[in-house]
């Protein structure tokens, strides 16, 4: 490709509304342009990267035995009504009617469509298992689109759906998809973790997220420093302390604390170690309980894990924190003065709290705390559960090493769905025993457009994008200095351009009448991995300057060797 026949569209300045680095660089590198809130046009450079991501995804899905299909973006409302998600999905589901007043949706996902297809196409267990995938546009009417294509309203996604007659068969496909996803993100040159994830409202028996590690990520990714253990923060288990509870050394004392309504204020005003404090949170009890609220206790420097807490049998779902009015109606004290002693409702304490002695907590009297509380002496040990977020340095749940926590961007997610959609849409086949059998499903998604942004968040410097070789828009940039004045430079540039293309290498020849500084800046901004610079001074010695974008190293290579050198660098 020649720049004279290409839309480069680079920007010198960073647009003011671009918050994260990927959004900034995608705009500056001429990859995307905003059309409306959460809607982007992909320009040629962006499309080239997008297609490379698509191709890697497609190759590995095919290698894993999945079959490609293509389903409509526009879906009839009756399928969503049949599955029950017409009411459940909420305002992110864009609904409209056609000229015949028939209701439709713009698909945010395709479980209903693929299940409808399968219930009409398959009739026997002999046709299974099957795994179908597509790379298709999705639309979710996000309330606040942000971060460019990281959280846009329209996006490209690879979604796959597998169908089975047994859990064992589903597990085999799930494992194959796990392996395929690992290959996909490894081939793209991304630093990622496959983490255990909560199945949430989708349900099912297993779920993994694939997280690209990046400072700008919205998720906390937890992983061991010595093993393969990894989970998202919601699911990571906080192990109980190994050391036995220390013996009591203090008497329980009622202390006036009128100005200490938070743990931070208590610690500061009374010079307490925060590890010797406990905070008490009240949430609504499950419907039908004999008590309206449940008290949850975590150590003062720990955070309640709301996903874990919601799974407690006595806690209402979704998790709902009690208002001050509701708290006072039950405990007769405000939120800043709560604790386990004389608590009139069920109490659940975290494993770490169970191992504490001589600790401070609210006295369930406004403006007062108890200091020197000890379990089984001052208050009976209540139910113990893992209800906190892990912190860096905690022991790994698999017994190997300690936990680290980094920010991550979710680029893929795999689920064992079970029979949620197949039951709702009555998708079944004749089983081996001749009876009707509801199908078991798995679903597997990759945010294709999000992968592009995530790759940038992990690969950039002060000059621009530093693409992993596998997804760079071009492999080689040829920068001929004063090409339009030097016949020798022009002739060699054309010769190398032809020879490299003949080797199957993607080349961008910068044949613009631009200053060298502009040419260098644009190629570094776009992030092309390999650059060769042709200039009369070096050619006097039969040399060409080569620069590798990732480390910035330059070297002189003989004119006759440059093509073989580049082929070796790119193809190995």
Swiss-Prot record:
What InterPro entries does UniProt report for this protein, alphabetically?
A: aa-tRNA-synt_IIb (IPR002314), aa-tRNA-synth_II (IPR006195), aa-tRNA-synth_II/BPL/LPL (IPR045864), Anticodon-bd (IPR004154), Anticodon-bd_dom_sf (IPR036621), Pro-tRNA-ligase_IIa (IPR002316), Pro-tRNA-synth_IIa_bac-type (IPR004500), Pro-tRNA-Synthase_IIa_type1 (IPR023717)
List this protein's GO terms for biological process: prolyl-tRNA aminoacylation
Keyword list (alphabetical) reads: Aminoacyl-tRNA synthetase, ATP-binding, Cytoplasm, Ligase, Nucleotide-binding, Protein biosynthesis
- What Enzyme Commission number does this protein have? 6.1.1.15
Q: Which Pfam families match?
A: HGTP_anticodon, tRNA-synt_2b, tRNA_edit
Name a single GO cellular component.
cytosol
Enumerate the PROSITE patterns for this protein.
AA_TRNA_LIGASE_II
Its subcellular locations are: Cytoplasm
Q: Does this UniProt record's set of keywords contain Aminoacyl-tRNA synthetase?
A: yes
Q: Which reaction does it catalyse?
A: tRNA(Pro) + L-proline + ATP = L-prolyl-tRNA(Pro) + AMP + diphosphate
Q: Under the GO molecular function aspect, what terms does this record hold?
A: aminoacyl-tRNA deacylase activity; ATP binding; proline-tRNA ligase activity
Q: How does it assemble?
A: Homodimer.
UniProt lists the family membership as follows: Belongs to the class-II aminoacyl-tRNA synthetase family. ProS type 1 subfamily.
What exactly does this protein do?
Answer: Catalyzes the attachment of proline to tRNA(Pro) in a two-step reaction: proline is first activated by ATP to form Pro-AMP and then transferred to the acceptor end of tRNA(Pro). As ProRS can inadvertently accommodate and process non-cognate amino acids such as alanine and cysteine, to avoid such errors it has two additional distinct editing activities against alanine. One activity is designated as 'pretransfer' editing and involves the tRNA(Pro)-independent hydrolysis of activated Ala-AMP.
Domain note for this entry?
Answer: Consists of three domains: the N-terminal catalytic domain, the editing domain and the C-terminal anticodon-binding domain.
Quote the NCBIfam families the UniProt record gives.
Answer: PRK09194.1, proS_fam_II
The protein's name: Proline--tRNA ligase
Q: What is the organism field in this record?
A: Escherichia coli O7:K1 (strain IAI39 / ExPEC)
